Amino acid sequence: ASGGDVNKATTGLGEEFETLNLGVKPYPSCRYSHAAIDGLIELKKELKFSSDDLDDIDIGLSETALNIIGYPLTDKQHPKSVVDGQFSMPFCAAVTVKSGGLQWDDYKNHLNNKDTLSLCNKIKVSPDEDAEKCCPEYMSAKVKVVVKGEKYEKFVKIPKGEPENFMEDVE
């Protein structure tokens, strides 16, 4: 093309590597679910609870996230396919509580699992001011759990896999 500026295309070549600014998805689900998954993993490690110990789970999300992975809640609590599961905060949270994370095989193992689907019904989603303030730069979440009558909360501003919170080699 005429009028192009080759200097714009080569500025920083060999010095600036834009791939270092890309995020990597550690879980096979909608990126909006990842901060909540991270928060649940952290709470499980800290509190050592099982699904039987849970009285309540509420995932606080931005409005954008709620519209993608939270609403309509009844549909999100009853995913019928892998894609439904990928875009269901209740399902992703239930699997994380049951298995300690979320991997591809979890869809096969949990989509028709009565215990997992029953746990989905305990999981609520709600608007969260802190998550909203971080959106759209970060896909944040606040996880609130009630374990054996005690309330706990974890806010994850930057989910794993973002350049500012990149995964460790073992992850």
Where are these regions (language model features)?
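Terminal-appendage/accessory-domain detector
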Residues: 1-171
